Amino acid sequence: MFISTRKFAAVRAFGGTFRSKSTNEFGRHLFKGAVAAPYLEWRGLSRNTLDTVDWTRDPVMTDKVAGAVLDWARDNGASVYCHWFQPLGAAGVRHGQSAQVQNRMFEFDKDGNQIWEFKGKNLLQGETDGSSYPTGGLRKTHTAGGYLGIDPTSPIFLRDDTVFIPSFLVSYHGYALDEKTPLLRSVDAISVHGSRLLKKLGYDVKGLTCNIGLEQEFFLVPRDPYNTRMDLQLTGRTVMGADAPRGQEMCDHYMSPPSVSGAPYSCMKEIQEQCFKMGIPLKTRHREVAPGQYEFAPLFGFVTTQIDQNLMVMQIMDEVAPKHGLTCLVAEKPFNNVNGSGKHNNWSISTTDGVNLFNVNQLAAKSGSREIFPVIMASVIKAVDEYGDLMRMSIATPGNDFRLGACEAPPAIMSVYLGDSMTHYMESYMHGSIEPYDPSTKVLNMGHTLPSIVIPNEDRNRTSPFPYGGHRFEFRAVGSAQNTSLVNTVLNTIVANSFKEFADKIEAGASPREVTQDALKKHWRVVFNGDGYDPACQEELTKRGLWRIDSCVDAINTYVSPKNTALFEAMGVFAPDECAARRNVQLQHYVGTVEMELKCMLDMINQHVLPSMRDANVGYVTELEEAVATLRRVWDDVHHTEDLGEKAAKARSLRLETMVEARCICDSAEKVCPAHLWSIATYKDLLFIDQTLS
């Protein structure tokens, strides 16, 4: 029987008058644009007031903005505000490691009556104990002042009953005690020096800014098995565990369809819905390469806003997952012998009116010159070649020691991928042949039945740490648990330095073309389009003299090399004392991570593995007891080492050698121990979530 679709069409018109609940609520908890406009206008302000930082310098306007925020908060059931900031060392066990001080937006009079009060001074500034966060020696208990100030470049948002005010944290003497302050300084540096360079090239702009897009990878595992694993609970990583019978052998996890009735699907939907309310545009979701691994990716945006949003995404993932019987793991390498997780940092520079400096056609159209683009590209090439050690330092997290160069992430050798067409263009320019670069798309003819496919001008290179992807560079080596403020601080700073040096030379009389060609000839070695996973290619890059720092500890120490402290100081990003402090914080973080992992391993061996082995009578007991004694002896040496750099180096050796030897014994025992006697969840229990929760 034929059933007409007319009734359906009348209710839900073709072309989509229907909108989902989540899209209808997009940005309703973000104090920006159409949401903020009526509250600002009610207070006599323009709907564009928040578009600049000028309002923060006018006490009258500040009070009015605070009043508008209060009205909006009350209308949404909020009564608490916090200055939300990013302490030093913001990566690791606590996802992103943000912090906040919460205060009520009302007081009480002598009769107990509630009085709503939220003034400009409350909005602009807060205070906290600066000595209770990692400071690397910049603050002590008897000199503990820490001062919070609003970051007007990142919008205020609301979650539950709390208004979040994105903020920076500095000491009594103005030292940066957080991750955001140097990031904002680096944006200023690239704007000042980049604008000066562009002016020398005949393109007058008001300023520059940086945009990023962060691809967030993570694992979702069943919560009940997770609760049997002390290592996952306390460190985010398994310190033991035999491989499951199935892993990535069939390459059948990546992009495979999620089960719409499964817990991961409903969990990811709720995460997106919560993010949409706060104006976080999570556009893409999909399965990743490893079993139980997934990814979210947002639309691009201003660097500080994107980082703030990513920190909140990690927090929301962490909080929503248990509601669906799951746990979210964002550590770089939670499981052995399957892919780890990263956070690809897609980075670009644009003028304040939206012209992307990496988009050759857009830049040429707006500036009237095709001579600017090769100068910009040469600036990046120069920066990576000179300061690849700083790029490596910016991704030197404990988890990345297991991930980089393991055929799942780029090697720890800093090179640049340009693609064939761009390489030919820049190489020709370097040798004096000025050819036009027209990155037009290509069309693949698929025959008579299938439609033609339009593809980009350049192929993808997933083995490069820093490939050019058309209009952006993608830093692919970033760890999944990282706050990417330091990553982008480094990128901005090293390129700002190139801009400054180019502008200085042009001002001294050199032609832009001469400056660019000289830089390309000097730094062309850093351009590499080959297979970064190939050991022969890695050997070639090492012979070229590129920055190769395999150890995270060695990379962290480059923070205080003379050339790097001089760079940061010259660009106004870090004082030398701030560099030294951050180096100390990162090394302490590394040692602390190893200590926690070791203690978990020892407890799990003594409380679970050895009893199971004895009950099952499977052998290995003597070997494991000897391994435990070795672990304790080596850690005792680490613990009593005074020099922090030496201590971290010893901790790394303990982690990657001594602990691995103990793990091998545990994993061998697991393989032969009867399942009913093994009290720790296995990789099979944790990774194959569709089978576990079906």
Q: Predicted regions span which residues?
A:
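Hydrophobic/aromatic-rich, well-ordered segments within soluble, folded domains that form packed cores
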Residues: 78, 82-84, 307-323, 349, ...
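Residue-level "edge-of-site" marker
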Residues: 62-63, 86-87, 121, 287-288, ...
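C-terminal amphipathic alpha-helical interaction region
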Residues: 524-694
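Histidine/acidic residue-rich metal-binding segments in metalloenzymes
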Residues: 18-119, 125-140
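Hydrophobic alpha-helix feature that most strongly marks membrane-spanning transmembrane helices
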Residues: 86, 110, 322, 352, ...
